[in-house]
């Protein structure tokens, strides 16, 4: 018996899975995606000097997952751009966030209670995209588990996976920020979600798709809203990975996460770096510091 049916939530899950995403949920997805684009250093200056490049970056933030999924499945990568309504809606959001007088629109949507609503609605879209991606890949490759997982993963986190391409459009090159090397919570969650939906699609997970969409959406909404409200870069998976990864791989997955140093107290970064140096290097560093002090004294 399906767990959701036993809890009398089957009808709720089914109704929830049938809620149309356009335009309300898609609008929220576009708003949050372009807000994160504006957070990037130099994004505002780029919009003033090179508005076309800024618009392309915004479209990549909004539709990058579709582009990457089409690329994986050998379909035209510009196919989604035939959806004129979504393109116009995303373009309108981009213009209001970057060019609205006095930044009124940006200030309104960034007001934390309002932003949390948009963040929650964005996660609804993310989970639905993962489920649709799995179904679409299953239609082409009935027994291609890895293809289904990969397609669902990029559907849920394609924007992050294309971050280096988006940086190139802004004239920035930071290979150390590769999302594969430093997975954020949405990227990891999309991967785990893609695995769950693949198991459900291939009948290895005995739950209905509507029930899985409902449960996983509630999980994503709860986690992402909490992380956004607390301005945290941590992941709910960190504790579990801390136990499993040392056993399976001999190290903690994502232990060198690029957010880890952000919370370090001021004045401890240099000492931490020095503590990781060999003894000989420490001596050379100390000798160099003494020479500099001597020169200043002279």
Swiss-Prot record:
Q: Where does Ca(2+) bind?
A: 74
Topological domains, Lumenal: 1-18, 73-85, 166-178, 231-234
Q: Which GO terms describe its cellular component?
A: nuclear membrane; sarcoplasmic reticulum; sarcoplasmic reticulum membrane
Q: Where are the transmembrane segments?
A: 19-39, 52-72, 86-106, 145-165, 179-199, 210-230, 235-255
On whether Transmembrane is a keyword of this UniProt record, the answer is yes
Note how its activity is modulated. Answer: Channel activity is activated by a change of voltage within the sarcoplasmic reticulum lumen and blocked by luminal high Ca(2+) levels.
Q: Does the keyword Transmembrane helix apply?
A: yes
Coiled-coil ranges (or none): none
* InterPro entries associated with the record: TRIC_channel
Checking Pfam families in the record gives: TRIC
What this chain does, per the entry, is described as:
Intracellular monovalent cation channel required for maintenance of rapid intracellular calcium release. Acts as a potassium counter-ion channel that functions in synchronization with calcium release from intracellular stores. Opened by a change of voltage within the sarcoplasmic reticulum lumen.
How this chain assembles, per its entry, is: Homotrimer; conformation seems to be controled by binding to diacylglycerol (DAG).
The protein's name in its UniProt record = Trimeric intracellular cation channel type A
């Amino acid at each position: 018996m399906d767990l959701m049916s036993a809890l009398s939530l089957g009808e709720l899950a089914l109704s929830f899975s049938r809620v149309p995403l356009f335009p309300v949920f898609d609008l929220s997805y576009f708003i949050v995606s372009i807000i994160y684009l504006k957070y990037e250093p130099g994004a505002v200056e780029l919009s003033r000097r090179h508005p076309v490049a800024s618009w392309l970056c915004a479209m990549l933030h909004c539709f990058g997952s579709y582009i990457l999924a089409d690329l994986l499945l050998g379909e035209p990568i510009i196919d989604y751009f035939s959806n004129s309504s979504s393109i116009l809606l995303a373009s309108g959001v981009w213009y209001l966030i970057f060019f609205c007088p006095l930044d009124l629109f940006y200030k309104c949507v960034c007001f934390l209670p309002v932003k949390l609503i948009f963040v929650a609605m964005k996660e609804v879209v993310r989970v639905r995209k993962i489920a649709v991606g799995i179904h679409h890949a299953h239609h082409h490759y009935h027994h291609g588990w890895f293809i289904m997982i990969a397609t669902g993963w990029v559907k849920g986190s394609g924007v992050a996976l294309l971050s280096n391409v988006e940086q190139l459009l802004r004239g920035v090159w930071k290979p150390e920020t590769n999302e594969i090397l430093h997975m954020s919570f949405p990227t990891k969650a999309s991967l785990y979600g893609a695995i769950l939906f693949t198991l459900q699609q291939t009948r290895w997970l005995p739950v209905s798709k509507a029930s899985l969409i409902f449960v996983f959406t509630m999980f994503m909404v709860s986690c992402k809203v909490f992380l956004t409200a607390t301005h945290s870069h941590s992941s709910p998976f960190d504790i579990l990975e801390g136990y499993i990864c040392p056993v399976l791989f001999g190290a903690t997955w994502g232990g060198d996460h690029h957010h880890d140093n952000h919370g370090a107290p001021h004045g401890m970064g240099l000492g931490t770096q020095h503590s990781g140096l060999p003894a000989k290097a420490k001596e050379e560093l100390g000798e160099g510091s003494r020479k500099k002090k001597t020169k200043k004294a002279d």
